[in-house]
């Protein structure tokens, strides 16, 4: 049972990361001032 829990946890974490990066990309496209620093960092991380 514990292995299934770990698999679900990992899948949820991966989904959250994907959603977060998509959100950042949208914010960067709209040129939101608050996200400009995150966008600069985001360009160096190969998502």
Swiss-Prot record:
GO biological process, one term: negative regulation of phosphorelay signal transduction system
Subcellular location: Cell inner membrane
Keywords: Cell inner membrane, Cell membrane, Membrane, Transmembrane, Transmembrane helix
Residues in the signal sequence: none
Cross-referenced InterPro entries: MgrB
Membrane topology, as annotated: Single-pass membrane protein
Residues annotated as transmembrane: 6-26
S-S bonds: none
Keyword Acetylation attributed: no
Superkingdom of the organism of origin: Bacteria
Keyword hit for Cell inner membrane: yes
CC terms in the record's Gene Ontology section: plasma membrane
UniProt-listed HAMAP family: MgrB
Function statement: PhoP-regulated transcription is redox-sensitive, being activated when the periplasm becomes more reducing. MgrB acts between DsbA/DsbB and PhoP/PhoQ in this pathway. Represses PhoP/PhoQ signaling, possibly by binding to the periplasmic domain of PhoQ, altering its activity and that of downstream effector PhoP.
Protein family: Belongs to the MgrB family.
Assembly, per entry: May form homooligomers. Probably interacts with the periplasmic domain of PhoQ.
Protein name per Swiss-Prot or TrEMBL: PhoP/PhoQ regulator MgrB
Organism: Enterobacter sp. (strain 638)
Encoding gene, per UniProt annotation: mgrB
């Amino acid at each position: 049972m514990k292995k299934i829990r770990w698999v679900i946890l990992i899948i949820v974490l991966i989904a959250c990361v994907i959603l977060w990066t998509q959100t950042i990309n949208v914010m960067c496209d709209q040129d939101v001032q608050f996200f400009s620093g995150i966008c600069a960092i985001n360009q160096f991380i190969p998502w």
